From Swiss-Prot:
Organism (species): Drosophila melanogaster (Fruit fly)
Transmembrane feature ranges: 101-121, 146-168, 174-194, 220-240, 266-286
Record-given protein name: Sideroflexin-1-3
Protein family per UniProt: Belongs to the sideroflexin family.
Membrane topology note: Multi-pass membrane protein
PANTHER family listed in its UniProt record: SIDEROFLEXIN (PTHR11153), SIDEROFLEXIN-1 (PTHR11153:SF8)
Length: 321
């Protein structure tokens, strides 16, 4: 058998400069079936990645596609910087099944105050686990950051959901069904900046086209965090808007009155179907390696870059997920 071609498996398989390429990448990375992989399968994938990176033969793989499958399975379960195996519900592959349960619960029981409190708390607990599991290996999230973010986001989501439920109780029922989306959006606007406060305070590292460090910018941090918030909200919008529309139609036609126990199962299954597509498509909205014009940076950062590379017009940074 001829040796496998050598490719850089630490870069995504697909072109990240196009939306389609980013979408394909995240479809593989967030594949919920990866959650079902056994410990032995994950270890096999890890060994393939280690050997291929080291330039050794990988007899387990007949084609380069086999290597890529192992790499995406590896990426779905191991921390990209530390290499540690992540807890199952904190993995990217768990996003769709976990958010299906959470979104379905939020949408089905939005009228009950105890249920609103429970599901918003459950959602923020899940978010905290995801943030901790995917924390930076070089700039880890402190325990204080995690607790502060968790408490503020949970409080923000609860205040938003409960106050809006009270405000719309005499309005169109469809508006009431949209309250969970607004609460989730509000929580994201609190949670993500809190979790990444260090970046807002100190800035993120800027690179040129050859990955040479060019400076540190707080403005780039604001841009990166803002795009992450938009991506998170975009992931939630399809399931949390299409589901209310569907349920409103079923309610008007008397289906829910005839089959009242079908309410929660229908919403949960429909949310799951939507999230299969919404999760990777939302992640793909913005490039992971974001770019920003040098002219739009802080004056001192811009001047420093101009001294190093007068001709450089664009710099890049990691926006996070």
């Amino acid at each position: 058998m001829s040796p496998l071609p050598r490719v850089n498996i630490d870069e995504p398989k697909y072109d990240q400069n196009s939306y389609l390429g980013r979408a394909k990448h995240f479809f593989l990375l967030t594949n919920p079936l990866n959650v079902l992989a056994s410990a032995s399968k994950l270890e096999e994938a890890r060994q393939i990645v280690i050997k291929y990176r080291a330039g050794k033969d990988v007899p387990e793989c007949k084609t380069i596609d086999d290597v890529w499958r192992a790499k995406y399975l590896y990426d779905s379960a191991f921390h990209p910087e530390t290499g540690e195996k992540q807890i199952v519900i904190g993995r990217m592959a768990a996003q769709m099944p976990m958010n299906t349960i959470i979104t379905g619960g939020m949408m089905a029981f939005y009228k009950s105050t105890p249920a609103v409190v429970f599901w918003q708390w459950f959602n923020q607990t899940f978010n905290a686990i995801v943030n901790y599991t995917n924390r930076s290996g070089t700039s880890p999230i402190s325990q204080q950051q995690l607790v502060t973010s968790y408490c503020l986001a949970t409080s923000g989501a609860l205040v938003t959901a409960l106050s809006l439920n009270h405000a719309v109780k005499n309005m169109n029922p469809l508006l009431g069904r949209l309250v969970p989306l607004v609460a989730v959006g509000a929580a994201n606007c609190i949670n993500i900046p809190c979790m990444r406060m260090q970046e807002l305070r100190n800035g993120v590292t800027l690179f040129d086209e050859h990955s040479n460090e060019m400076g540190i910018s707080k403005k780039a941090a604001v841009v990166g965090i803002s795009t992450v918030i938009l991506s998170r909200i975009a992931m939630a919008i399809p399931g949390m808007t299409l589901t209310p529309v569907l349920m409103n139609v079923l309610e008007k036609r008397g289906f829910l009155a005839k089959y009242p126990r079908s309410n929660a199962p229908i919403q949960t299954l429909f949310c799951g179907f939507v999230l299969i597509f919404a999760t990777p498509l939302g992640c793909a909205f913005f490039k992971q390696r974001a770019d920003i014009k040098v002219d739009s940076l802080e004056s001192e950062v811009r001047d420093s870059i101009r001294k190093k590379r007068p001709e450089l017009e664009t710099v890049w940074f990691n926006k996070g997920l």
